[in-house]
Amino acid sequence: MNILQINSSARSEGANSTRVANDVTTRLLAANPDATVTVRDLAKNPVPVLDEAALGALFAPVESRSTDQAARVAASDALIAEVQAADVLVLGVPMYNFTVTAQFKNWIDAIARAGVTFRYTANGPEGLLKGKTVYVALARGGQYRGSPLDTQVPYLKAVLGFLGITDVRFIYAEGLNMGPEAAAKGFAQAAADLDAALAA
């Protein structure tokens, strides 16, 4: 089993989403001791924004790409290869202003590429990253589970599903900024969610 852990907090140290993601990976390793783990920290190694230069590089013919364009595409190719090689993804996803972090969105923009991780067919789009399981470690300062303000879960289901990943399991750590008692309950709920996710 190949496990890919993506830490998407803007903080490389002390992030609650990373704490919960680490718990997921630790449990997966306990059940699969021969598994390999790759960890990508998007705070320490940020993915560039999908800007005009990036689009120019992606759409330029291979033989006419500049050195900078070739390097930009190669960096995106490496991120895609990590996902393609993974059997399981563990995503540490904090809530920033009711959505995912900019770091996470940049990663999604790098791995979602037509003809590589999805394709358009006569019957509509088809995801090409089938057969993977994703554990999403959600960390929130408040409590939003099941409410209209929880825009992360439908977004993640949509974008991962578009890429062919439909086995997506969510672990919620909420109320983490609402005082010590609420935070303790939030981490306890995350542990319970993880038990259920691993048993699914």
From Swiss-Prot:
Cofactor(s) of this protein: FMN
GO MF annotations in UniProt: electron transfer activity; FMN binding; oxidoreductase activity, acting on NAD(P)H as acceptor; oxidoreductase activity, acting on NAD(P)H, quinone or similar compound as acceptor
Catalyzed chemical reaction(s): 2 a quinone + NADH + H(+) = 2 a 1,4-benzosemiquinone + NAD(+); N,N-dimethyl-1,4-phenylenediamine + anthranilate + 2 NAD(+) = 2-(4-dimethylaminophenyl)diazenylbenzoate + 2 NADH + 2 H(+)
Keyword NAD: yes
Pfam families: Flavodoxin_2
Superkingdom, natural source: Bacteria
Keywords: Flavoprotein, FMN, NAD, Oxidoreductase
Top enzyme category: oxidoreductase
Cofactor binding notes: Binds 1 FMN per subunit.
EC identifiers of the protein: 1.6.5.-, 1.7.1.17
Disulfide bonds: none
Stored InterPro entries: Flavodoxin_fold, Flavoprotein-like_sf, FMN-dep_NADH:Q_OxRdtase_AzoR1, NADH:quinone_OxRdtase_FMN_depd
Binding site for FMN: 9, 95-98
Cited function: Quinone reductase that provides resistance to thiol-specific stress caused by electrophilic quinones.
Family assignment from sequence similarity: Belongs to the azoreductase type 1 family.
Assembly, per entry: Homodimer.
PANTHER family: FMN-DEPENDENT NADH-AZOREDUCTASE 1, FMN-DEPENDENT NADH:QUINONE OXIDOREDUCTASE
Protein name: FMN-dependent NADH:quinone oxidoreductase
Organism of provenance: Azoarcus sp. (strain BH72)
Lineage, broadest ranks: Bacteria, Pseudomonadati, Pseudomonadota, Betaproteobacteria, Rhodocyclales
Recorded name of the encoding gene: azoR
